[in-house]
Design a protein with these regions (language model features):
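Structural motif
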Residues: 26-27, 35-36, 46, 95, ...
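Short, solvent-exposed loop/turn motifs
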Residues: 30-32, 50, 99-100, 139
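Short, compositionally biased P/S/T/A/G/V-rich stretches that sit at domain boundaries
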Residues: 35-38, 44-74
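Post-signal peptide N-terminal segment of mature Sec-exported envelope proteins
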Residues: 14-37
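Bacterial signal peptide processing site
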Residues: 7-9
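Glycine-centered loop/turn motifs
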Residues: 22, 55-56, 67-70, 88, ...
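Long, low-complexity serine/threonine/glycine- and acidic-rich segments characteristic of extracellular
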Residues: 79-148
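C-terminal motif of bacterial Sec signal peptides marking the signal peptidase cleavage site
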Residues: 3-5
C-alpha cells in the first residue's frame, strides 16, 4: 500500500523551526519539502534543526509530464514511480507549489505509482512539478519543469 498525500500544502506546525532555505511546499512534524532555485529537497527535523534528508534507497522516476516537455494539456496528468528498500510511508505531488489530489498504488509496500492533475487549468507557459516520497527514515524529492 502506498500512502498518498501529506495533508495541506505548506502546513506549518507551530513552535517548530522553519525548513529551508527556499519555499516550503510541505511541512509536517518531522518531514518537509522545500524548493530552492528549481531544486527540490526533502528535509528531516533532527532535534531543533531541519537537515537534508538521507535519500538512501528512496527513488523517484518522473513519468509525466516529461521534464522539459512543451505543449502539454492545460490540465496535465502528473505521475511518478516510487521505490524504496523499506515500506513507503508518505508521498505527494505538487504543481507550482499546490499539492495535487493524488491517487496511487503498487504491488508491494516498497514500489508504487502516484498520479494526479491540477484542480484548475494551468496558464500557458512553464510550470514546476515536485514529487516526494519517504520511508520511516529516508526521503527524497525531485523537481522538474514542463510547459503548457
Amino acid at each position: 500500500m502506498i500512502a498518498v498525500g501529506c495533508g495541506s500544502s505548506a502546513a506549518k506546525q507551530s513552535g517548530s523551526p522553519t525548513p529551508g532555505p527556499g519555499q516550503v511546499v510541505y511541512q509536517g512534524t518531522e518531514w518537509a519539502v522545500v524548493i530552492d532555485g528549481g531544486k527540490a529537497s526533502a528535509q528531516h527535523l533532527v532535534g531543533d534543526a531541519w537537515r537534508p534528508a538521507r535519500q538512501g534507497t528512496v527513488k523517484i522516476r518522473v513519468l509525466g509530464p516529461k521534464p522539459g516537455s512543451k505543449g502539454n494539456p492545460n490540465i496535465p496528468q502528473v505521475a511518478a514511480a516510487l521505490s524504496a528498500g523499506d515500506d513507503l510511508a508518505e508521498s505527494a505531488l505538487w504543481v507550482d507549489g499546490v499539492e495535487l489530489l493524488e491517487k496511487g498504488g503498487g504491488l508491494t509496500p516498497t514500489k508504487g505509482t502516484i498520479y494526479g492533475a491540477p484542480a484548475a487549468p494551468l496558464a500557458k507557459g512553464r510550470h514546476t512539478a515536485i514529487a516526494y516520497a519517504r520511508t520511516g527514515t529516508q526521503a527524497f524529492a525531485v523537481a522538474w519543469t514542463f510547459s503548457v
